[in-house]
Amino acid sequence: MKDVIVIKIGGVAAQKLSDKFIKQMQEWIAAGKKIVVVHGGGLVINQLMKERQLPTRKVKGLRVTAKSDLPIIEQALLGQVGRTLTQELNDSDIESLQLVSHLGKTVLADFIDKDLYGYVGQVTAIQTAYLEQLLDADMVPVLASLGENAAGELLNINADYLAAAVASSLQAEKLILMTDIEGVLEDKKVLPQLLTSQISKKIQTGVIKGGMIPKIESAVQTVLSGVGQVLIGDNLLTGTLIAEG
């Protein structure tokens, strides 16, 4: 869909939207842009796990998720982060709707590797009908990084991968992956642009590592799927632009 911008919010930004963020969204909406928000909630999940004295473990930047962790993750993402984000947007006259009952019908997923990651999913399909219905009504859909498999089991999904899948399925004009750092850093400086052909070497040399790996991988997939622009940064306008080449 032309004029669609998909924004993934993570890190500190997922806990409190800045005035600058709100203003930019308002400007885009006034200019006729349609926006989808996808969010994670790692900080809140970590806090809830810590309170329950449960371990947090990551493999290749992805959170290992036991079945018993799912109620905690669901509480963090749907009950806290998503609800707060939606409320903040609505309070700023940005009409928004948090997907709860429709989420599992919209985000279809399957296990990545149950033995290695547990209840962590990869997106198999995005059913866009309900999202398009909301966008046509000038509403902002707010999606937590969760999905369901064919058996109706809840799966934890990396928010960067989910945002990429949503952007690709809607053929958005832009995907923005917001994080706590200014962009992809090399020698403590932000790289203004990264070509898809440079990515594997940057991972091999350790320039791209940890939680930045799924961001970059999802950015590359999105660019190659036909989405015009993918930006990684700590705001909506500047950072590292991922381009095909």
From Swiss-Prot:
Q: Which GO terms describe its cellular component?
A: cytoplasm
Where does it localize?
Answer: Cytoplasm
Enzyme class, UniProt record, top EC level: transferase
- InterPro entries given in the database record: AceGlu_kinase-like_sf, AcgluKinase_fam, ArgB, Asp/Glu/Uridylate_kinase, Glu/AcGlu_kinase
Q: What is its EC number?
A: 2.7.2.8
Which amino acid positions bind substrate, per UniProt? 41-42, 63, 156
Q: Which UniProt keywords apply?
A: Amino-acid biosynthesis, Arginine biosynthesis, ATP-binding, Cytoplasm, Kinase, Nucleotide-binding, Transferase
MF terms from GO for this chain are: acetylglutamate kinase activity; ATP binding
Q: Which reaction does it catalyse?
A: N-acetyl-L-glutamate + ATP = N-acetyl-L-glutamyl 5-phosphate + ADP
Identify the domain of life: Bacteria
NCBIfam families according to UniProt: argB (TIGR00761)
The family line of this record is: Belongs to the acetylglutamate kinase family. ArgB subfamily.
The name of this protein is Acetylglutamate kinase
Q: Which organism is it from?
A: Streptococcus sanguinis (strain SK36)
UniProt lineage: Bacteria, Bacillati, Bacillota, Bacilli, Lactobacillales
Q: Which gene encodes it?
A: argB
